[in-house]
């Protein structure tokens, strides 16, 4: 028999990627409003384990953010 105080470990449900699905937004370097949601207060790209973006879409997102920074649409550092 199991111990009286033993509990099952808590498993957090894996979030789904916000860029996959039928009406998901397209990653575009010109869409600075969308890209700002994936940049931290300090201006760093937020990791996929926090945003739940898939690996393929995270690479696309990083490329779009870097492209927007280069063109001056997004800042490199936010003060």
UniProtKB/Swiss-Prot annotation:
SUPFAM superfamilies: Ribosomal protein S18
UniProt GO molecular function: small ribosomal subunit rRNA binding; structural constituent of ribosome
One GO location term (cellular component): cytosolic small ribosomal subunit
Gene3D superfamilies associated with the record: Ribosomal protein S18
UniProtKB keywords: Ribonucleoprotein, Ribosomal protein, RNA-binding, rRNA-binding
Keyword Nuclease: no
InterPro entries the record matches: Ribosomal_bS18, Ribosomal_bS18_CS, Ribosomal_bS18_sf
BP GO terms, sorted: translation
Lineage: superkingdom: Bacteria
Subunit structure: Part of the 30S ribosomal subunit. Forms a tight heterodimer with protein bS6.
Record's function text: Binds as a heterodimer with protein bS6 to the central domain of the 16S rRNA, where it helps stabilize the platform of the 30S subunit.
Family, as annotated: Belongs to the bacterial ribosomal protein bS18 family.
Record's protein name: Small ribosomal subunit protein bS18
Native source organism of the sequence: Rhodopseudomonas palustris (strain HaA2)
């Amino acid at each position: 028999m199991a111990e009286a105080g033993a509990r099952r470990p808590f498993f957090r449900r894996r979030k789904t990627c916000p860029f996959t699905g039928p009406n998901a937004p397209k990653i575009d370097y010109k869409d600075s409003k969308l890209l700002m949601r994936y940049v931290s207060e300090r201006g760093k790209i937020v990791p996929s384990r926090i945003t739940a973006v898939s690996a393929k879409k995270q690479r696309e997102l990083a490329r779009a953010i870097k492209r927007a920074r280069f063109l001056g649409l997004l800042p490199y550092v936010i003060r």
